[in-house]
């Protein structure tokens, strides 16, 4: 079974009103995490036991790739707010601007960093993706041998038909699901630095604390804390995998980030990558599960969320951060 975090459950209950994966926040602290509820969908008036279906068929105008970024909310990290490689500039100071930044980069096939643990991106498609029982969609990362920075995948069906990802998120099962070292509802609070060019401090729901290191020699922007987050602290909630990264050299010069077996983005898996040279990871809607680990039957999905699953850092390489380059419907045809 998973290790489920109850330590700060009362705190989360008081400060969050989770709305379909995006959390409401109080005036002092922002909270972002998966929906705690798992409703089956709105009722059909003619048959209350049958959920309404808002399935969106493909049309002649449809495309295989994602068509919308609904929310880009990274954790702090070395590429956040950074111009040279991160592609940010001084205009990215609102959530809308951040979403547009992410979409423009992904449309060009350029990676977007999710930062440290809990950072995420939500994308949608112009059609519903069918559950075929096999691999249904893929997310592109930038992993390579000994450099895997796994991101967990969540899926959502547009249950209320409003075209927005405000219904129920379901986590997709991966190779680490059910292990004692995997922690559900793991929460990290990030703190805005009081001075420029400083590390970002964090505390977690396990009573631990640490920092996102400031790597001035490589990324010297003033802040690694997202400029569009208005509050001085914010919380990211998700499922945490046990870190596997280690310093092979023993001198801090050569860090290895081993592969996880399967089920994660930006992971150099020999199982779910379609070819040896591919950086795409394939996913099955049939691997969806509820918060208790029970299988969930979804005929289709409309939205995908990718979230950094590791809270760790690798010396001069910095924080372990999932990168996303795109997402597409594997079985697309019209």
Task: Show where each model-derived region lies.
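A domain-level signal for the mature, folded cores of soluble proteins
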Residues: 34-149, 173-334
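N-terminal secretory signal peptides that target proteins for export/translocation
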Residues: 1-7
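Bacterial signal peptide processing site
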Residues: 26-29
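Sec-dependent signal peptide recognition
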Residues: 7-15
């Amino acid at each position: 079974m998973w290790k489920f975090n109850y330590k700060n459950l009362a705190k989360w209950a008081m400060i969050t009103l989770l709305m379909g994966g995006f959390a409401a926040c109080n005036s002092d602290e922002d909270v972002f995490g998966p929906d705690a509820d798992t409703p089956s969908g709105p009722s059909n008036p003619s048959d209350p036991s049958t959920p309404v279906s808002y399935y969106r068929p493909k049309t002649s105008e449809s495309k295989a790739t994602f068509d919308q970024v609904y929310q880009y909310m990274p954790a702090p990290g070395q590429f956040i707010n950074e111009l040279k490689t991160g592609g940010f500039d001084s205009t990215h100071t609102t959530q809308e601007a951040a979403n547009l930044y992410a979409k423009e980069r992904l449309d060009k096939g350029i990676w977007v960093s999710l930062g440290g643990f809990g950072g995420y991106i939500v994308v949608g498609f112009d059609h519903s993706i069918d559950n075929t029982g096999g691999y249904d969609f893929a997310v592109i990362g930038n992993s390579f041998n000994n450099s895997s920075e796994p991101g967990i995948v969540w899926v959502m069906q547009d249950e209320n038909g409003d075209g927005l990802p405000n219904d129920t998120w379901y986590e997709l099962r991966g190779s680490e699901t059910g292990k004692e070292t995997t922690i559900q509802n793991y929460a990290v609070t990030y703190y805005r630095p009081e001075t420029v060019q400083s590390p970002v401090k964090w505390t977690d729901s396990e009573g631990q604390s640490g920092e996102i290191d400031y790597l001035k020699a490589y990324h010297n922007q003033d802040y690694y804390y997202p400029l569009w987050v208005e509050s001085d602290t914010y919380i990211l909630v998700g499922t945490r995998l046990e870190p596997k990264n280690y310093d092979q050299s023993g001198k801090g010069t050569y860090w290895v980030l081993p592969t996880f077996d399967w089920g994660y983005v930006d992971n150099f898996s020999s199982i779910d990558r379609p070819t040896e040279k591919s950086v795409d990871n394939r996913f099955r809607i049939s691997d969806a599960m509820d918060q208790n680990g029970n299988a969930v039957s979804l005929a289709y999905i409309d939205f995908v969320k990718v979230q950094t699953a590791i809270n760790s850092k690798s010396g001069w390489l910095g924080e372990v951060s999932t990168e996303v380059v795109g997402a597409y419907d594997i079985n697309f045809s019209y």
